[in-house]
Design a protein with these regions (language model features):
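Short, positively charged low-complexity motifs
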Residues: 1-7
Length: 217
């Protein structure tokens, strides 16, 4: 049950409960999907009973993401550069060690939620969810729905922003019906107009403020 007993994935490999924080982060040179996914996944983990989940980032926030966080009134994730040996981590929006945190090879990877090709090898089993969709947040949207976890207005805004960013307002060739369905639902929950808000967001990340949406896309 959401909010009930901790997820069994929080057992260490030797069967003992691992105390301490769970660090959740996306790739280096973070984009909007990476930053929002860490925040959305941390919220998901807390709702699932992991009170130690912490959203992190591996680099500076770009202008587009800054616009999103300011618009929604949400603080940026904590900046980290490396993790200690044995630290519990969850990877979002990436799985390749070369794009990840320093010392990942000595961390305890609990979960991966992603939409990229698989480049990760571990010597132990873990929860791995990757789908061929346009954005990690589309996968996160499905995880919330499957687990009966409420998507509130701000979480919906984060998810929506990332899908708009990664799929360029659903116009990128990587866009799938899953992404379109998520955007439709998340627009209702967040109260944001994907076209109007999305264009403002994309403009904020560029110096294309004088161009129309058709010229940009």
């Amino acid at each position: 049950e959401p909010g009930g007993s901790p997820d069994p994935l929080y057992h260490k490999r030797n069967g003992e409960i691992e105390m301490g924080k769970t660090y959740i982060f996306g790739h280096k040179n973070p984009d909007t999907d990476t930053i929002t996914s860490s925040l959305v996944m941390a919220n998901f983990e807390r709702k699932m009973g992991n009170s130690e989940a912490v959203a992190c980032r591996l680099g500076n926030i770009n202008k587009e993401t800054e616009y999103v966080l300011n618009y929604l009134g949400i603080e940026a994730p904590e900046l980290i550069e490396k993790v200690e040996d044995g630290a519990n981590v969850i990877l979002v929006d990436h799985n390749s060690p070369s794009e990840s945190v320093e010392n990942l090879e000595n961390a305890n990877i609990l979960k991966v939620v992603d939409h990229h090709k698989i480049a990760l090898n571990t010597s132990y089993p873990l929860f791995y969810r990757a789908e061929p969709v346009g954005c990690t947040e589309t996968v996160m949207y499905k995880l919330y729905k499957e687990n009966g976890i409420e998507i509130d207005e701000k979480i919906a805004g984060l998810m929506l922003s990332a899908i708009i960013s990664d799929t360029l307002l659903l116009k990128s060739p990587t866009t799938t019906d899953e992404d379109r369905k998520a955007v439709e639902e998340l627009a209702k929950i967040s109260g944001l107009d994907p076209e109007v808000y999305g264009l403002d967001m994309l403009k904020a990340g560029t110096d294309l403020s004088s161009f129309t949406i058709d010229e940009i896309l």
